[in-house]
Swiss-Prot record:
Domain Protein kinase: 284-537
Protein name: Tyrosine-protein kinase Src64B
Binding site residues for ATP: L290, G291, R292, G293, N294, F295, G296, E297, V298, K312
Domain spans labelled SH2: 162-259
The encoding gene: Src64B
Biological source species: Drosophila melanogaster (Fruit fly)
């Protein structure tokens, strides 16, 4: 006996949605049972999909294409109950198969994950893991785990090549101004000021100014849709982008191509290591020495001959194994896009390895003194200052003090991406302060006076260190307190001495006054990292050309 697929009311709603005859009950899935024309049930049927010859979803039964929220965990995200776009109410029991689309190519790293190509469509089977989902590739029919941040819900705005979810204006400028991008390269990003709006950023060129980026506000309509100029409105972001890709319509230039997206952050070497991070030493190849740290050497290497990694080693006898592994535990626990990611450790024999994210440009200090950082413009330095403040704001929120914040402990990657590293002296604190054991070494020129004299470290002593880092940054790697030994520094600071404003580099008065606030003798009077991050985020915006308006 055939299964009864739906009520009379459901039939009526679907028929009203498609009065021209586009609706066929046999083409849709209700509840968990697919109903074919013979009335038989098929539990293996494709849920919520109109079965056309191409095998793709009918656009009337897809989620809102401008849904921009992050992919949700545990089946709570996405759209489970769907309805025809032309009807005000849904049809109970109509279920949409959850499909994601690949935003990047991905190569399998172990036996449990799945290789895929950009554009591949995959059905989600299990979304309970926070970083890895189990899927079936709808092209190859292979099943396996995939990294969540490499995919987006199909037909959502996140799946568009031109949409950048977590990009601020300064970062948009850096991405668009890459040399390989022609005039008209563009991206769309969420507005920093309007929670329902967006911003369109376009690379342009003018005589006397050269290449630069123009920004336009995309404003929402009350009844749905978007506009840049009031005489041109569009039902979706996709429609808006398509229109301005055919005609500039008052923009500085026609939208020529989407800005290339950087690869997303990977927090694990592979899904097998998401819950454990001890790996065999034989899987690591040390290829090139990068430098020497407080407790050992740092190498560039490969994991399983495929993945770039940085490997920090512990010299025997310089630090206890337990303390070294404590550093690893801290780095693994805290995740932020401005902190260097820890991948794994090799602790079964000496020397112990910490395997972490590789940053191609090395330390900020070397970058400023010897690398491409020597040629950075002032706005580039502001961008780096903002990123470091963002990472420290995160540590501040987690009650974690760094205790060794300096340019040598910030790493630089492509597009001047900056990340904080070296938690060798960091400690998680339950109170506001941490007092180290006697005999602990710390860098005097970067250390707050209360930490030098009384051994009391807090997030406010990190703020002091951040002020010293800013001096390093804006002087392109100059040594703090030039010509002074550590003892002289301590004595002078106690007498109220502070480094003067440099005269051999561009150094605005307002930034120097901010440094003096970071160096206040009273820790409680120093600014928070939340304030510092907001200050530098706003700094470049207020000094740049405002958002453009397109004339009606």
């Amino acid at each position: 006996m055939g299964n009864k697929c739906c009520s009379k009311r459901q039939d009526q709603e679907l028929a009203l949605a498609y009065p021209t005859g586009g609706y066929k009950k046999s083409d849709y899935t209700f509840g968990q049972t697919h109903i074919n024309s013979s009335g038989g049930g098929n539990m293996g049927g494709v849920l919520g999909q109109k079965h056309n010859n191409g095998g793709s979803l009918d656009s009337r039964y897809t989620p809102d294409p401008n849904h921009r929220g992050p992919l949700k965990i545990g089946g709570k995200g996405g759209v489970d109950i769907i309805r025809p776009r032309t009807t005000p109410t849904g049809v109970p029991g109509v279920v949409l198969k959850r499909v994601v689309v690949a935003l990047y190519d991905y190569k399998s790293r172990d036996e449990s994950d799945l290789s895929f190509m950009k554009g591949d469509r995959m059905e989600v089977i299990d979304d309970t893991e926070s970083d890895w989902w189990r899927v079936v590739n709808l092209t190859t029919r292979q099943e396996g785990l995939i990294p969540l941040n490499f995919v987006a819900e199909e037909r959502s705005v996140n799946s568009e090549d031109w949409f950048f979810e977590n990009v601020l204006r300064k970062e948009a400028d850096k991405l668009l101004l890459a040399e390989e991008n022609p005039r008209g390269t563009f991206l769309v990003r969420p507005s920093e000021h309007n929670p329902n709006g967006y911003s369109l950023s376009v690379k342009d060129w003018e005589d006397g100014r050269g290449y630069h980026v123009k920004h336009y506000r995309i404003k929402p309509l009350d009844n749905g849709g978007y506009y840049i100029a009031t005489n041109q409105t569009f039902p979706s972001l996709q429609a808006l982008v398509m229109a301005y890709s055919k005609n500039a319509l008052g923009l500085c230039h026609i939208l020529s191509r989407p800005c290339p997206k950087p690869q997303p952050q990977m927090w694990d070497l592979g899904p097998e290591l998401r819950d454990k991070y001890e790996i065999p030493r034989s899987e690591i190849q040390l290829l090139r020495k990068l430098g020497r740290g407080n407790f050992g050497e740092v190498f560039y290497g490969k994991w399983r001959n495929s993945i770039d990694v940085a490997v920090k080693t512990l010299r025997e006898g310089t630090m206890s194994t337990a303390a070294f592994l404590q550093e690893a535990a801290i780095m693994k626990k805290f995740r932020h896009n401005r902190l260097v990611a820890l991948y794994a450790v090799c602790s079964q024999e000496e020397p112990i390895y910490i395997v972490q994210e590789y940053m191609s440009k090395g330390s900020l200090l070397d970058f400023l003194r010897e690398g491409d950082g020597r040629y950075l413009h002032f706005e580039d330095l502001i961008y780096i200052a903002t990123q470091v403040a963002s990472g420290m704001e995160y540590l501040e929120s987690k009650q974690l003090i760094h205790r060794d914040l300096a340019a040598r402990n910030v790493l630089i990657g492509e597009n001047n991406v900056a990340k904080i590293c070296d938690f060798g002296l960091a400690r998680v604190i339950a109170d506001d302060e941490y007092c180290p054991k006697q005999g602990s070494r710390f860098p005097v020129k970067w250390t707050a006076p209360e930490a030098i004299i009384y051994g009391k470290f807090s997030i406010k002593s990190d703020v002091w260190s951040y002020g010293i880092l800013l001096m390093e940054l804006f002087t392109y790697g100059q040594v703090p307190y030039p010509g002074m030994h550590s003892r002289e520094v301590i004595e002078n600071i106690e007498r109220g001495f502070r480094m003067p404003k440099p005269t051999n580099h561009y150094f605005p008065d307002n930034i120097y006054q901010l440094l003096l606030q970071c160096w206040d003798a009273v820790p409680e009077k120093r600014p928070t990292f939340e304030f510092l991050n907001h200050y530098f985020e706003s700094f470049s915006v207020t000094s740049e050309v405002p958002y453009r308006e397109v004339q009606d």
